[in-house]
Amino acid sequence: MTNIRKSHPLFKIINDSLIDLPAPSNISSWWNFGSLLGICLAIQILTGLFLAMHYTSDTTTAFQSVTHICRDVNYGWILRYLHANGASMFFICLFLHMGRGLYYGSYMYKETWNVGVILLFAVMATAFMGYVLPWGQMSFWGATVITNLLSAIPYIGTNLVEWIWGGFSVDKATLTRFFAFHFLLPFIIFALVLVHLLFLHETGSNNPTGVPSDSDMIPFHPYYTIKDMLGALVMILALLMLVLFSPDLLGDPDNYIPANPLNTPPHIKPEWYFLFAYAILRSIPNKLGGVLALVLSILILILMPLLHTSKQRSMMFRPLSQCMFWLLVADLLTLTWIGGQPVEHPFIIIGQLASILYFLLILVLMPITSIVENHLLKW
């Protein structure tokens, strides 16, 4: 008799995705982040669901309801901080996952990569709307500043912003719809994750060498299930350390002040994981130009397969390209730092140079470096 996991229509899908899936024998710990992202999504959906049971999306009570969750609901404080810091952990895993994809040429699986870029946009939208919900000062002013960027769109901009706001400013209607979308989007993300996996399993995983590994595959279970469990343990430990020892480390103190439309905070800035894009936005003096640069800083990822000029897929054996990659990482860290600084000298010029370097590296320097390497290898 055939094993039920191989014959049952539902179990067969799970079996082919997580148990009997052929996987390259040499994938490193950099391939752990996909499963870690799945765990992050599960944590976010579960903690978010329980938070939504006690949260009220009304401007008069939103801030108080979050305070009530932390003070009066059983283990409400841990739910709230798991959710807030879980988002940070989500983005850490997301950035590392994308970095792995860039380094090892995983973007050559175009469908998987493009769905991944759409996922990134969806996660960023969800995180932004979630940050508005506690209705603190940074929530209110962050929502005002970021939604206001749409007014830079010619002709329809102003109408579009007022349509999103549901009025003439960020108010009750805005908060209610942001809560609705913040609740809905994670389920759309979950559906996109399934599409992401569907495309991945069409081709199979890449591996550090970038060479096809069809001749040397091993079953996903038990080898990579146990490896993923170790990764999950380390990540959950890191998350719990953050939540239990310094839950407000990555947050903004201004968000403990209730939203006040009459009082602007000295430095309006988003959560740390958006700072690199925020720095690119601020480095261009023109409003529309800044918005375009902001969108292109993420959208540029879709061009990665087109910008791949090397004869090799992975950067594993390409030292010059490795230098360019780590320069890009350093540049993104610089942009993240600049995004959190006030708009004054010398931060303005540093931000502008880092923004130029970001686009220059991806569009010009990395493709040229790859061509140089091809010539050095006489390919």
Swiss-Prot record:
Keyword Transmembrane helix on entry: yes
This protein's UniProt keywords: Electron transport, Heme, Iron, Membrane, Metal-binding, Mitochondrion, Mitochondrion inner membrane, Respiratory chain, Transmembrane, Transmembrane helix, Transport, Ubiquinone
InterPro entries (UniProt xref): Cyt_b/b6_C, Cyt_b/b6_C_sf, Cyt_b/b6_N, Cytb/b6-like_sf, Cytochrome_b, Cytochrome_b_C_euk/bac, Cytochrome_b_N_euk/bac, Di-haem_cyt_TM
Ranges that cross the membrane: 33-53, 77-98, 113-133, 178-198, 226-246, 288-308, 320-340, 347-367
Record SUPFAM superfamilies: a domain/subunit of cytochrome bc1 complex (Ubiquinol-cytochrome c reductase), Transmembrane di-heme cytochromes
Cofactor binding note of this UniProt entry: Binds 2 heme b groups non-covalently.
GO CC, one annotated term: respiratory chain complex III
Binding site for a ubiquinone: H201
Residue sites binding heme b b566 per the record: H97, H196
Pfam family, one: Cytochrome_B
More info: Heme 1 (or BL or b562) is low-potential and absorbs at about 562 nm, and heme 2 (or BH or b566) is high-potential and absorbs at about 566 nm.
Protein's name in the database: Cytochrome b
Species name: Pteropus rufus
Gene: MT-CYB
